[in-house]
């Protein structure tokens, strides 16, 4: 693409790679040769925004040194559902603490709160509009975890951490696979459509209310159909042959 008229460069992105969890199929890559820090949940336990910003700045330098210019992080989701398997990537359940640490994280990676600069690593805050309250703790990478609920009418509570991202002029926002179940916001019912396709969430709320004018980046495989293998799982022959379950398309 760099050779065409528009001169658009290829952008290399990555999930977090400065922590302990190694799950390259989904959420995080072990630090390896990169500096190793506590998971973001551990950083939240420390509760020091200056430290989180320092972490982001160090990780920024490491990313750029190897040609990575986009971070598929931070997670602004709140850990209000302890059964959900991704709470280690959050900043906990306190929405105000999460807001301050999300802001600091982005300022470290993007070098301040003035948006993208020549030495920035673009951050992608996720998963709008708050993926923490997965129904029964089941994850929306799978068709059986597609519902997202906000018990006690706490939808607005889950939006607060994203305010920190917008204050830091985050470069991109990623919605999740899930669909909102029985959700109302400011007296209006939200259509039960996946967040990545939901006009009320992306156009009215994100673009309209929050005035976000950056990139909306869909989560991976968002248009894949959920085929028979996706719904029923691998056959015994496939399991015996060592077929990875991550070859199964993500279900919507």
Residue positions per predicted region:
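Glycoside hydrolase catalytic-domain context in secreted enzymes
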Residues: 1-252
